[in-house]
């Protein structure tokens, strides 16, 4: 069986037309005849490229406003025909072999992402002929090359030059895998969209039903492997890093690594925690993370001051940590980090060339640049359980000054309000039960992950004492309500003067009374931030 077949005829029909003119020109220069449809054929002709319209080839016009273009035996026979097996049938019906199919699909995802998208808009952007051709060509990859990614154009032309206008079976097989991945992702998007639409569309008057409709009945997820890893969370666990396509928001998954060793499983998890936390602040900020928990967070007039203050919270835990900034990493800050501590990862929106030169002296330090960000984009969070998947909206909500309810007799000062909001933002990113002490926009002690809220508070106090930081006059944030007054009594003993928490306990009044007895400020957010 001949494994490499010269490409003599190609069918081009694309929605994303970037690079298609140059690719078509390259095919023509190599003697390939072109078939095409609608807008693609028009674009090629306008650029002086010889092309035959599919409707002229089949003798059957496009119809139903473009719904039927390529669904014809002369097209699919040419794609599916097995060389050496179906030749006689193809000759009998005057079907020419199609050796390459270049297709990408209607922009369904972009259409449904529009705020004003109607169900009719979505329906008209469901591609039928495209996926059919893609699957046909991928099925017959022994004889046909299927191209769904514009990024493959140059490599394909280069290989054709090396192989007498043909592609190897290995290449065609790889292209077929990409094609099946492409159609699977496309169908998943459609299924997810309609799955979450069905209840609100048909029962819009039933609010509860509409809420159920936010999540599809069947959830189809598509992620692309970005990186294989030496191991996972522990040395005996195999692992890989998968990412979503077309992520618009600055994130660890889209960050560019400027230097250093490959990111490990734990590096990625910790860097994500650090970056998402530092994105909460508009002022120059630094977040230092260890084992997915912030161990030091601070604001400053610039990121150097923010880093120095964040490091001061817990220098011991900062060793081997992850450092994130919300401003460009500059030379002075990079120098301070490299001279002071061992660090696994540094991530910032941008990195100055001078800072990059400084970090080069520590070649193993992973330096990442994630780009700037604006407001957070709503997304889903997933948590795997044995035999299932918990799905929820990502916790992107945050209160501001107008949302706070002061329930104590004593009113907070302007600085205390600033510190309370700062402390509350940090607590959101600390594993529950979370207690954070802060003063002047700097964490003083962080207690994370304890089964008892009181013990988290004790740990925060111990950490502050160990580093010589004064708790007296600090504010305290708790990610969830205080079920009893004991947490407030303990806080008062160490000098906490203001407390922020969600409220909502059956004993809220008892807790408020405790704050008043100690002349403390108590502020309720009415929003919880559990983190497990």
UniProtKB/Swiss-Prot annotation:
What is one Pfam family matched by this protein?
AICARFT_IMPCHas
GO terms for biological process?
Answer: 'de novo' IMP biosynthetic process
Coiled-coil spans are: none
Q: How is this protein annotated for GO cellular component?
A: cytosol
Spell out the InterPro entries in the cross-references: AICAR_Tfase_dup_dom_sf, Cytidine_deaminase-like, MGS-like_dom, MGS-like_dom_sf, PurH-like
**UniProt entry keywords in alphabetical sequence:** Hydrolase, Multifunctional enzyme, Purine biosynthesis, Transferase
Query: Which Gene3D superfamilies has this protein been placed in?
Result: 3.40.140.20, Methylglyoxal synthase-like domain (3.40.50.1380)
- The EC number of this protein is 2.1.2.3, 3.5.4.10
Catalytic function, reaction form: (6R)-10-formyltetrahydrofolate + 5-amino-1-(5-phospho-beta-D-ribosyl)imidazole-4-carboxamide = 5-formamido-1-(5-phospho-D-ribosyl)imidazole-4-carboxamide + (6S)-5,6,7,8-tetrahydrofolate; IMP + H2O = 5-formamido-1-(5-phospho-D-ribosyl)imidazole-4-carboxamide
Determine if rRNA processing is one of this entry's keywords.
no
The pathway where this protein functions is: Purine metabolism; IMP biosynthesis via de novo pathway; 5-formamido-1-(5-phospho-D-ribosyl)imidazole-4-carboxamide from 5-amino-1-(5-phospho-D-ribosyl)imidazole-4-carboxamide (10-formyl THF route): step 1/1; Purine metabolism; IMP biosynthesis via de novo pathway; IMP from 5-formamido-1-(5-phospho-D-ribosyl)imidazole-4-carboxamide: step 1/1
Q: Where is the MGS-like domain?
A: 1-148
Sample GO molecular function, one term: phosphoribosylaminoimidazolecarboxamide formyltransferase activity
Concerning NCBIfam families, the annotation shows: PRK00881.1, purH
Q: Which family does it belong to?
A: Belongs to the PurH family.
The record's note on its domains: The IMP cyclohydrolase activity resides in the N-terminal region.
- This protein is called what? Bifunctional purine biosynthesis protein PurH
């Amino acid at each position: 069986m001949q494994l490499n077949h010269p490409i003599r005829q190609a069918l081009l029909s694309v929605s994303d037309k970037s690079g298609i003119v140059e690719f078509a020109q390259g095919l023509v220069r190599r003697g390939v005849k072109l078939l095409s449809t609608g807008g693609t054929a028009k674009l090629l002709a306008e650029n002086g490229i010889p092309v035959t319209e599919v409707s002229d080839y089949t003798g059957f016009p496009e119809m139903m406003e473009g719904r039927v273009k390529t669904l014809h035996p002369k097209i699919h026979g040419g794609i599916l025909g097995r060389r050496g097996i179906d030749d006689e049938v193809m000759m009998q019906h005057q079907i020419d072999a199609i050796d390459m199919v270049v297709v990408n699909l209607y922009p369904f995802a972009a259409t449904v992402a529009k705020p004003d998208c109607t169900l009719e808009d979505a329906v008209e952007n469901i591609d039928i002929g495209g996926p059919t051709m893609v699957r046909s060509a991928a099925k017959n990859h022994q004889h046909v090359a299927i191209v769904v990614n514009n990024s493959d154009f140059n490599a394909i032309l280069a290989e054709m030059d090396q192989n007498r206008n043909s592609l190897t079976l290995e290449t065609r097989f790889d292209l077929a895998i990409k094609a099946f991945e492409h159609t699977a992702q496309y169908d998943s998007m459609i299924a997810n969209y309609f799955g979450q639409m069905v209840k609100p569309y048909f029962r819009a008057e039933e609010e509860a039903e509409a809420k159920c409709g936010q999540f599809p009945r069947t959830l189809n997820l598509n992620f692309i492997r970005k990186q294989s890893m030496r191991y996972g969370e522990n040395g005996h666990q195999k692992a890989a890093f998968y990412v979503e396509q077309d992520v618009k928001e600055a994130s660890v998954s889209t960050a560019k690594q400027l230097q250093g060793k490959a990111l490990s499983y734990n590096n990625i998890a910790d860097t994500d925690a650090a970056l998402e936390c530092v994105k909460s602040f508009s002022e120059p900020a630094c977040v230092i993370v260890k084992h997915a928990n912030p161990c030091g967070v601070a604001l400053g007039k610039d990121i150097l001051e923010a880093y120095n203050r964040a490091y001061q919270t817990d220098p011991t835990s900062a060793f081997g940590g992850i450092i994130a900034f919300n401003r460009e990493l500059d030379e002075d800050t990079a120098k301070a980090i490299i001279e002071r501590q061992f660090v696994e990862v540094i991530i910032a929106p941008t990195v100055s060339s001078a800072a990059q030169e400084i970090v080069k002296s520590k070649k193993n330090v992973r330096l990442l640049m994630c780009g700037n960000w604006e407001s957070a984009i709503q997304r889903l969070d997933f948590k795997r359980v044995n035999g299932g998947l918990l799905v929820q909206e990502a916790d992107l909500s945050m209160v501001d000054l107008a949302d706070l309810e002061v329930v104590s007799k004593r009113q907070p000062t302007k600085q205390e309000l600033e510190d309370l909001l700062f402390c509350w933002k940090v607590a959101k990113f600390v594993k529950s039960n979370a207690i954070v002490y802060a003063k002047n926009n700097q964490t003083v002690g962080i207690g994370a992950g304890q089964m008892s809220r009181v013990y988290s508070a004790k740990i925060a106090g111990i950490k502050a004492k160990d580093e010589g930081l004064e708790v007296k006059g600090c504010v305290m944030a708790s990610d969830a309500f205080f079920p009893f007054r004991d947490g407030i009594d303990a806080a008062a003993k160490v000098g906490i003067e203001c407390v922020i928490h969600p409220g909502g306990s059956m004993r809220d009044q008892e807790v408020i009374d405790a704050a008043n007895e100690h002349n403390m400020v108590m502020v309720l957010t009415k929003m919880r931030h559990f983190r497990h």
